[in-house]
């Protein structure tokens, strides 16, 4: 299953969205990689 970067944790490259509610997903850029963090 996909693993997201939990809120408040450092960026992790190449993670996938995993929040149940898309509105809780925040797309951020970390060193040129698109990563996902749960709001």
Curated annotation (Swiss-Prot):
Q: Can you provide one Gene Ontology molecular function annotated for this UniProt record?
A: toxin activity
Q: Where in the cell is it found?
A: Secreted
Which is a GO BP term held by this UniProt record?
defense response
Question: Is Disulfide bond there in the keyword field?
Answer: yes
Q: Tell me the disulfide pairings in this chain.
A: 4-19, 11-30, 18-38
A single GO CC term for this protein reads: extracellular region
Report the PTM annotation: Contains 3 disulfide bonds.
Q: Which keywords describe this protein according to UniProt?
A: Calcium channel impairing toxin, Disulfide bond, Ion channel impairing toxin, Knottin, Neurotoxin, Secreted, Toxin, Voltage-gated calcium channel impairing toxin
**Pfam families per record:** Omega-toxin (PF06357)
Mind telling me which InterPro entries this protein's record contains?
A: Omega-atracotox, Omega-atracotox_CS
Keyword Disulfide bond tagged: yes
Q: Where is this site: Critical for insecticidal activity?
A: 10, 29, 37
Q: In which tissues is it expressed?
A: Expressed by the venom gland.
Q: What does this protein do?
A: Potent inhibitor of insect, but not mammalian, voltage-gated calcium channels (Cav).
Q: What is known of its domains?
A: The presence of a 'disulfide through disulfide knot' structurally defines this protein as a knottin.
Recorded family membership: Belongs to the neurotoxin 08 (Shiva) family. 02 (omega/kappa toxin) subfamily.
Record's protein name: Omega-actinopoditoxin-Mb1a
The organism named in the record is: Missulena bradleyi
């Amino acid at each position: 299953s996909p693993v997201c970067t939990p809120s408040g944790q450092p960026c992790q490259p190449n993670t996938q969205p995993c929040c149940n509610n898309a509105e809780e997903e925040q797309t951020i850029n970390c060193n040129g990689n698109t990563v996902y963090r749960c709001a």
